[in-house]
Swiss-Prot record:
Source species: Schizosaccharomyces pombe (strain 972 / ATCC 24843) (Fission yeast)
Top-level taxon of the source organism: Eukaryota
Protein name, entry field: UPF0039 protein C11D3.02c
Pfam families: Acetyltransf_10
Record domain N-acetyltransferase: where: 9-150
GO CC list: cytosol; nucleus
MF term (GO), any: acyltransferase activity, transferring groups other than amino-acyl groups
Membership in a protein family: Belongs to the UPF0039 (ElaA) family.
InterPro entries noted in UniProt: Acyl_CoA_acyltransferase (IPR016181), GNAT_dom (IPR000182), GNPNAT1-like (IPR039143)
Amino acid sequence: MSNLEFVYKYFNSLDVKELYDIYLLRTNVFVVEQKCAYPEVDEIDLKCGHLMLRNANGKLVAYARLIPEQQQTVRIGRVVVDPDERKNGYGRKLMLQALETSKQEFSSSKTFVLSSQEYAQPLYRSVGFKKCSDAYLEDGIPHVEMRLEL
């Protein structure tokens, strides 16, 4: 797991290959793997930060987007790890970096929120998030809201 590189960019700074890699990974997981026939690309992509984790070969292995919301709150969304790269700890590394990058980019950030698929809660709990809602359906998949207060 050495030679990993985090890259953080806003939409207008992404090159064509980075954008392709992001949309390919998200579509392969959120649409194809999870059989979720809902649009994957949305207007949020235009105004959020894109956090990418690449391996030594330059392959995009994990991704999340960082969305500043109301005062002092950042939403972490579209957290995804390449199916072939799971069980390598990339999800946890990504989340720790997402928190660190959010603190740097949005210095007043004190609260972090996300919408977790039910099965992914242990990952988010491992970095300090706590469940703060009952289960609800998002695109037909059970989710819960989770929050981390600094």
